[in-house]
Amino acid sequence: MGGGGRGRTSQKPLMERVSVDPPFTVSDLKQAIPPHCFKRSVIRSSYYIVHDAIIAYIFYFLADKYIPILPAPLAYLAWPLYWFCQASILTGLWVIGHECGHHAFSDYQWVDDTVGFILHSFLMTPYFSWKYSHRNHHANTNSLDNDEVYIPKSKAKVALYYKVLNHPPGRLLIMFITFTLGFPLYLFTNISGKKYERFANHFDPMSPIFKERERFQVLLSDLGLLAVLYGVKLAVAAKGAAWVTCIYGIPVLGVFIFFDIITYLHHTHLSLPHYDSSEWNWLRGALSTIDRDFGFLNSVLHDVTHTHVMHHLFSYIPHYHAKEARDAINTVLGDFYKIDRTPILKAMWREAKECIFIEPEKGRGSKGVYWYNKF
């Protein structure tokens, strides 16, 4: 994956840590953003769906028509190339579905939910279920008590296998499992998520993740996935399991992998603090994320990779205004804005090695600020 893409903000020192309250307010940041950045156009938003869908169809057509007739050595190279390209484009569509959940697609909530439901269901994601848990994450980012996901553990609570596998081969194994199965395991078992009094997942309408008024839509999300699975069953009957796996299954798994890598890197970095209830507030939490540079993939992924800090502050800004809004608020954020342009594979390895558990900030009277550390 890419690194070293273009942008106006220079790389900040890796170990720079800012945990004091910012000298500005959300209102100050909002006033710095040009008003048109908050405008959502259903026509412009729909253009990106059509654009991505056409490219996805072209990739599908080429893979279905030509890869099977290639000689074996070339086919073994062509399939992984198709999987990467198709997964990249489908992740872009997933990002648009995610924007629908933030009401950033159009001025009409029903349009946003309809589009998001279709896109996410096709990509095997329970739209409403994830929308609601993701809303909780945005409301409580980096709160050790209330955040919904990516909640780090203290040194004493780190699983034994992390200690046993604290070497390069073991780290590779953990990374492989984390980045391939992390999102499905989170949806099914709430792994790395907020601890509830009973078992929680994204498919049970009675899960403690959801409020009473949300339960019907959680069921609707399940029905959407069942409809897609029925379509997969028909495709398997018509074309065979191997064809469906290669054309659809592996690219969707690739979407999950992209999601895991992107969100992990957005929320895992030595410069990102976590807070307990004595120190946390919404603005502090929203600023405790970091932008990443995925090179040429930034545009393919609709800039979700390097506008994440802005997104946590103003999640209803559509992606086609995100870079302009980011640059506008950076004049106010100053050192409170974080971006790391380390090449992505290198960053993944470094974070997996350095960010194992959290410890209280040293030299403070309050113990409410925590930082990543390693064994």
From Swiss-Prot:
Reaction(s) catalysed by this chain's protein: a (9Z,12Z)-octadecadienoyl-containing glycerolipid + 2 Fe(II)-[cytochrome b5] + O2 + 2 H(+) = a (9Z)-octadec-9-en-12-ynoyl-containing glycerolipid + 2 Fe(III)-[cytochrome b5] + 2 H2O
Regions that span the bilayer: 54-74, 77-97, 110-130, 172-192, 218-238, 242-262
InterPro entries, per the entry: FA_desaturase_dom, Fatty_acid_desaturase
Record motif Histidine box-2, residues: 134-138
Motif stretch (Histidine box-1): 98-102
CDD domains xrefs: Delta12-FADS-like (cd03507)
Tissue occurrence: Seed.
Entry's Gene Ontology BP terms: unsaturated fatty acid biosynthetic process
Cofactor(s) the record lists: Fe cation
Keyword hit for Membrane: yes
Top-level taxon of origin: Eukaryota
Listed pathway(s): Lipid metabolism; polyunsaturated fatty acid biosynthesis
Record localization: Membrane
Record GO cellular component, one term: membrane
EC number: 1.14.19.39
EC primary class: oxidoreductase
Secreted among keywords: no
Predominant cellular place of this UniProt entry's protein: membrane
Gene Ontology molecular function, alphabetical: acyl-lipid Delta(12)-acetylenase
Bilayer topology term: Multi-pass membrane protein
Entry keyword set: Fatty acid biosynthesis, Fatty acid metabolism, Iron, Lipid biosynthesis, Lipid metabolism, Membrane, Oxidoreductase, Transmembrane, Transmembrane helix
Record comment regarding domains: The histidine box domains may contain the active site and/or be involved in metal ion binding.
Role, per record: Changes the delta-12 double bond of linoleic acid into a triple bond in the biosynthesis of crepenynic acid.
Name recorded for this polypeptide: Delta(12) fatty acid dehydrogenase
